[in-house]
A protein has these predicted regions:
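An extracytoplasmic/periplasmic, membrane-proximal ligand-sensing/linker region
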Residues: 146-204
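Second-shell loop/turn segments in exported
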Residues: 41-50, 73-74, 141-144, 176-183
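A conserved helix-loop-strand patch within extracytoplasmic ligand-binding domains
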Residues: 1-50, 58-61
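Hydrophobic residues within well-ordered alpha-helices
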Residues: 37, 87-88
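A ligand-binding cleft/hinge motif common to bilobed small-molecule-binding domains
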Residues: 61-62, 88-89, 93-120
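Solvent-exposed loop/turn segments at secondary-structure junctions
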Residues: 17-19, 47-51, 81, 100-104, ...
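Short helix-initiation/N-cap motifs at beta->coil->alpha
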Residues: 67-85, 131
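Periplasmic-binding protein-like
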Residues: 1-10, 112-155, 172, 176-181
Length: 204
């Protein structure tokens, strides 16, 4: 399996009348308006969730100059399972979730949630966030011992650890499979997300 360094959050429209309306618009190549998204019922996660709140809020900010806090019809779900149940029942029109979530809830959709069609037929992606980078091993920019040679050697050491079976066992405690090199610009979206969170916290 090829290692990935990031994932994306998706805004998924469900089988409600509004959900279908938004999906049809996006699938026709039209851009959603603020009126489109603000008139929908949204399911979001708690405010510390990257895929269920932070990055969808960043997407709203980049596309409409708004945040999740500006959505008049947003409810917080206690889990992705309950969010998908609400989407299936039509209680919400859009849910914010991680990119692989539909695969994870495919069986529940036609089982526990009682839907006739598959989750793939009943739902559609109406928004995609910037990349959410996975965990990072970072070093201090101000430490005098952190010269370029040391940084490169440290990075290569972690990559080497992740390339051995023994190393994989050690890093499995973090749910890591291995490491790949990164550059500072990979985390620009994360910096923007953190700035947005700080501005929301200071406004509240």
């Amino acid at each position: 399996t090829e290692q990935v360094t990031s994932y994306r959050a998706l805004m998924i429209a469900g089988p409600s009348e509004k959900g279908k309306e938004l999906a049809a618009k996006v699938n026709a190549g039209e851009e959603l308006t603020w009126e489109d998204v603000s008139s929908a019922n949204w399911s979001v996660a708690n405010s510390s969730s990257p895929a269920g709140y932070i990055y969808p809020s960043l997407w709203l900010q980049e596309n409409f100059g708004k945040n999740i806090t500006d959505l008049p019809h947003a409810v917080q779900s206690d889990s992705y399972g309950s969010a998908f149940a609400r989407l299936a029942s039509g209680q919400v029109d859009i849910l914010c979730t991680y990119a692989d979530a539909r695969r994870d809830y495919e069986d529940e959709w036609t089982g526990e949630y009682g839907m006739t069609n598959s989750i793939w037929d009943d739902t559609a992606v109406v928004g995609v966030t910037p990349a959410i980078y996975n965990d990072t091993i970072s070093v201090s920019k101000t430490s005098p011992i952190m010269d370029d040679d040391f940084k490169q050697a440290l990075g290569q050491a972690f990559i080497n650890i992740g390339n051995t079976e023994e190393g994989k066992e050690v890093i499995a405690i973090y749910s890591h499979n291995g490491y790949l090199p990164a550059q500072s610009s990979d985390y620009d979206s994360e910096r923007a997300a953190q700035e947005m969170i700080q501005s929301l916290n200071s406004a509240g």
